[in-house]
Amino acid sequence: MFLQNMIIQDIQNGDGVCFIDPHGSDVQDILANIPQERLEDVIYFDPSYTKRPMGLNMLEYNKEYPEQKTFVVNELFSIFQKLYGGNPESMGPMFEQYFRNATMLVIEDPATGNTLLDVSRVMTDKVYRDLKIMRCKNPVVVDFWKSIAGKAGGDASLENIVPYITSKFDVFLANDIMRPVIAQEHSSFNFRDIMDNKKILLVNLSKGRLGDINAHLLGLIIVGKILMAALSRVDTPKNELNPFYFYIDEFQNVTTDSISAILSEARKYKLGLTMAHQFIAQIDDGIKDAVFGNVGTISTFRIGSDDAKYLENQFAPTFTAGDIMNIPNYNCYMKMLVHGVPTDPFNMATYPAPEGRPNIVEDMKQLSYEVYGKDREEVEANIAKKYRK
């Protein structure tokens, strides 16, 4: 309810918003509260709607900002570390070396394919790999594929490394829901345009329909794209930037260590970030330190004893751990940063989101599918072309 009301207020104020909903229910209530004059600003992204899939390409970058290539490679590797970190022995230094060089080889020449599908192809298809090498202008990457990968034997041989990398891509590429989304050459919406022009991006990542790992991958990609778009705003004077508000529920599942960059850097580019989660043990130590070391405003509803003890220093001396453990339903404690100055903590009552106009929700979804989606048969045909010899 709290997040919903904040998002609805931003939308009603005419601001740009992105919301990642891991449940799929909150976005329905938000859609019902879109003002009439903002209906055309809405982009509703539901990857489980397969008739007209929308593209989301992590490897896509703006050629006017060549530094984005390095960001894409680093962020993609961080994403796969996040997804497969439970099995660290499969992602050692050799895996990283091949992974980074395969990704760099692909993005050096977008014209010959620039998706996650093509990273997998460049590992398995020698003809395609040779084409990429011929067109690659990065001498370090070319040297790796010719002098190191091409001559390595034993455990370091290309044939031995390939399954370790492609198996991690194939989980998504073989999935009938995911493939038409992540294998499109161009994302269906431009994140910089969304931020600059006050668009409303509502992302439905319902795990029940997508599965955990698929939902997490898409969420991680969107967070990376938002960060990349925010950092590219360095070319615009601050007084000309429109503020943009980014909301993430269950953020621990869709953030890498780059969240520290969002918290410390992106505020310069008028990106406001609001993150919600259920308990602190969900968060990796590195991300936890980045979050609590950078956030300006903290709000807590009733929580358990361990989390209450952890947060007590944030709310003392006004509230104790015992107070935090006994907050009434629909109430919270809040500590804000106002004009760079911390306020004293205070308690606050929250209210349900307004009912809005539920009758407009399905029409708004269909509008997004028509404007931003592509016919599935067309998408699958374009993908199939890449496998024709």
List where the protein language model places each region.
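P-loop NTPase motor domains
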Residues: M1-L271, I287, I324-P328, C332-P342, ...
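Conserved H-loop
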Residues: P22, A276-Q282
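P-loop NTPase motor core of the ASCE superfamily
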Residues: S78, S90-M94, A261-S264, A281-K389
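Active-site-proximal loop/turn and secondary-structure-junction residues that shape catalytic pockets
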Residues: K207, Q252, F279-A281, S305
